[in-house]
Amino acid sequence: MKRIFLFIATNIAVIAVMSVVLSLLGVDRFISQAGLNLPMLLVFSLVVGFTGSIISLLISKPMAKWSTGARVIDAPSSSTELWLIDTVSKLAQRAGIKMPEVAVYDGEPNAFATGAFRDSALVAVSTGLLQSMTKDEVEAVLAHEVAHVANGDMVTMTLVQGVVNTFVVFLSRVVGYFVDRAISRDNNNSQGIGYTITVIVSQIVFGIAASVIVAWFSRHREFRADAGAAKLLGSPQPMMKALARLGGIEPTSLPEGLASLGINDKPGFAALFSSHPPIEDRIAALRSLQ
C-alpha cells in the first residue's frame, strides 16, 4: 500500500503544480480563446496527464527513500541485513531481474518495492516486519515485492495513472468552460473566476473518483504479485502464512472460514479506495493454487 500511496500522492502533487503553472502561462486561455477546442484540449490533457505520471515514476525511488527514511544496505552490518541481501538476491535471480537495492526503515510491519525500471528497483522492509515475522514469512513478503518488480507493476501503474490523469484534466476543463459560460455576462471567450474555481473543484472531485479506478487496478496487481511470490518460493504456503500474520490470524491454523474472523483491509464503501484486496480473499486465491 505504501508503494501505491506514494506514487498517487506524488502524481497528484505534480499534476496540481503543472496545472497551476500552465494556467499562469495562459495555456488554458489559449485553448478556449475561440470557443472550446476539444482536439487541442485533448492533446493538452494527454501531455499534462502522462507527464505527471512519468515524472512521478522517475522520482518514485528517491521520494520513497526520503518519505520513509529508508536506509539502503550498502554494506551489511548485521546477520539480519546479510540475510536480507542474500534472500533478495536469490529471489531476484529466480525472477530474472537484476539485484534491487535493499533498504530498511523504521515503522509498523510493512514493505514496498518501487523504481522506474525493473533492473534498478528498490525493495524496502520495515523494522516492525522484521521483528514480528519469522524468516520464512519475511521471505514470502520479499518474494511478493520482487514479483511486483518482475511484473513491471510500477510502469503499468504509470500508464493507468496517465490515462486517468488525461480524463481528469480534460473533463475538469470542459466542465469549467460550460460553467463559466453559464455564469459569465460577457459574450467573448475570456475566462472568468468561475472557470478557475470550477476547474480546481472538478479536478479534486474527478481525481477522487479516478482513484477508485487506480485502486481497483492495484488490487488486481496484488493478486498477481501473490501468485508470483508463490511461484518464486515453489509453494503458496509461505505467502499464506505471511498474509495471515499481517491479518492477525494465527498463521499455523489458516482456517477455511476466514471471512467470519472479520479480516478486511477496509470494510464497506472505503474498500473501493483500498489498494489491497481483503486478506481473506488473497489467502483464498493462494489456496486455489495448491
Swiss-Prot record:
The active site is at 145. Belongs to the peptidase M48B family. Its EC number is 3.4.24.-. The lineage of its organism: Bacteria, Pseudomonadati, Pseudomonadota, Betaproteobacteria, Burkholderiales. InterPro entries: HtpX_protease, Pept_M48_protease_HtpX, Peptidase_M48. One of its GO terms (cellular component) is plasma membrane. The chain crosses the membrane at residues 4-24, 39-59, 159-179, 197-217. It comes from Janthinobacterium sp. (strain Marseille) (Minibacterium massiliensis). Zn(2+) binds at residues 144, 148, 222. This is Protease HtpX homolog. Binds 1 zinc ion per subunit. It holds the Pfam family Peptidase_M48. One of its GO terms (biological process) is proteolysis.
